[in-house]
């Protein structure tokens, strides 16, 4: 369910642990409606192929692709009917990783992402550098959250920081396009 601006109304996780993991497919409903939320989302394509919308950009995706949906980005998925999409996703609030003022991780990475001054590359494919490390961490985060072993929340935070480290090392976090963000903000107000 979404509001008039297409903002998703459902919450992901809890106040204490604002993370949720999903395993989904487009078998019955051939698309995932266009929506946006304040949380980031990581989507790993298990099998199949289709299209992913990220704001005004349409990406063709296939098995093995990792899609990164930055916070506030309008997004949706549509499957190829002959090759149904199956995917896993992680939706998380960047506040989960926040640190105090002066903390280097907070100042140089998290704050920039939270304020839309930096963003993740939208898609990482098997042929891209650092792909294996990044996808192994996606899998570890998804599994850790699903299994919920004792003190899993500590491990989750460590895994997310490792994920961010690998993204930085692969140059997959870049300065944001401020003009694009302004025009999209006006679209959401309509």
Protein language model annotation of sequence segments:
Residues 70-72, 78:
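Residue-level recognition of conserved beta-strand edge/terminus positions
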Residues 120-130, 145-190:
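Short, Lys/Arg-enriched, Trp-marked, Pro/Gly-tolerant hinge/linker segments that flank
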Residues 47, 71, 92-94:
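Residues immediately flanking
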Residues 1-20, 78-143:
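A hydrophobic/aromatic-rich effector-binding and dimerization subdomain
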Residues 1-62, 66, 73, 106-108, ...:
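Generic protein-terminus/edge-of-domain signal
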């Amino acid at each position: 369910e979404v509001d008039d601006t297409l903002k998703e109304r459902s919450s992901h996780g809890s106040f204490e642990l604002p993370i949720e993991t999903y395993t989904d497919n487009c078998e019955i409903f051939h698309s995932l409606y266009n929506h946006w939320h304040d949380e980031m989302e990581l989507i790993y394509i298990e099998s199949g192929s289709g299209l992913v919308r990220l704001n005004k950009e349409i990406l063709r995706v296939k098995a093995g692709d990792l899609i990164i949906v930055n916070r506030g980005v309008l997004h949706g998925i549509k499957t190829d009917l002959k090759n149904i999409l199956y995917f896993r996703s992680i939706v998380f609030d960047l506040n989960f990783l926040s640190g105090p003022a002066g903390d280097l991780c907070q100042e140089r990475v998290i704050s920039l992402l939270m304020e839309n001054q930096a963003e993740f590359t939208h898609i990482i494919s098997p042929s891209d550098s650092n792909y294996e490390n990044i996808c192994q961490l996606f899998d570890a985060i998804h599994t850790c959250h699903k299994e919920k072993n004792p003190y899993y929340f500590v491990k989750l935070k460590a895994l997310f920081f490792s994920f961010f480290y690998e993204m930085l090392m692969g140059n997959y976090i870049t300065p944001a396009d401020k003009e694009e963000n302004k025009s999209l903000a006006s679209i959401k107000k309509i």
